[in-house]
Amino acid sequence: QSVENFDLIHPEKVIQMAMKNMPIDYFEYYTTVEPFAEGYYKIGKKEEARKILNQLIKKQQEKITFFNSQSEKQKAFYAREINDDFRRYYMLLLIAEENNDLEFHRQQIVKFNNYNKMMGDYGVDLEQ
């Protein structure tokens, strides 16, 4: 059977298959999942994009909350990792903003700023 005879797979099906094989709750390489949120935005599936972003944001919030529970010595030791987690968190918000999901972005940026304040000196200084 020639390649011409195969139907093209709809982008939504590709994203669904990928998300099925990389479940966020069990798969730690979260940056590889971000493009699927972007993909959902591109095909007009805003709620699906938000669902992925919310799951990824929750993971970042959990990590930041964990670091916040640590001693100052531990926070200092993990300062670079904390900074990286905040930057990953912020990048998730940019996905929504760049895809004109401004309502979601506005809601989430408030939460981001609260987590940033919670970490005090270990938060990040991002121009928003």
Model-derived segments and spans:
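C-terminal luminal/periplasmic domains and tails of membrane-associated envelope-modifying transferases
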Residues: 1-128
